[in-house]
Amino acid sequence: FGYLKKNDWFHLGIGSNLTLIDFKKRKEIRELEVGIDFNYDADTSGNSNPITIGQENEFTFFNSSKFQFSWDLKTSGKDTTITRKNVDFPYVKNMGSLSFNIDYESPSYGIWEYDWRIGYEDAEKYKSFNSDGYRRRYAKVGGSFYPTDNYRIGFTARIRSEKEWLNWIENNELAVYDLSQKIISINMNWYRGTKHEIRLKSQFVALQAKNPRSLIVNESGYLTESFKDVDPFSEGITSFQIRYKYEIVPLSYIYLVYTKGGSIFENNIMRETSEIFKDPWNNPDNEIFSIKFRLKY
């Protein structure tokens, strides 16, 4: 149970968890953790966000693998943040939705392991404009490879698509898009004794928002069609860093760091996904090589 009040916003949450460990007929299961949560948010003017009821079930097996499935039910309510605290248009009314997620983490296969996740969310149709209802689909797959104790490389790919993704533009002007987001992450860690360490972190994001439809929200929070032109857009984001650390003496280090990254936003220009990934890498906002020292006296 928890209660939090901050500035013009407060949150009330109630949750319960139960762990089961005695599975005589399914001896491969080590434990099952079952949880349920209730969350309520609102601003101090009495505008209530959607109430959320969530339920989660996680199986842990003796081979160290895990399987989880969960669902969340959201009621209709008011989104009090999307219009950036506009005094005349303080919120947008959202429709209720149901979401479901499944996760799996594999056991270790000696030198490698993997995990995946799939999820969806479907919402009711808006009645104030020609709506097909919000829909979200999500998939993730990842893996790690560790042929030796001192070397590990990990890879993760995420794909997310949304129909009627709602985006604020300015004042009471909004738009819904068909959104596609793809994320690739690669990480690596290598060390030799206590003297040498190389660490790589990287993430590449490609976002596309297509088929925009212009909307406006009235003082009561209802969305209606607008005739204003809205452009599709795309954005690519790159974050890359490789770092070498050398221990001079215990607790004193020298770091050689190479960082490269940036973002490129294109309005009304549709690009291929490969171009969205490559553009911020080929035209970065920053590219820095630095040397740092950390000395203990």
PLM feature spans:
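Exposed, low-structure sequence patches enriched in small/polar residues
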Residues: 1-297
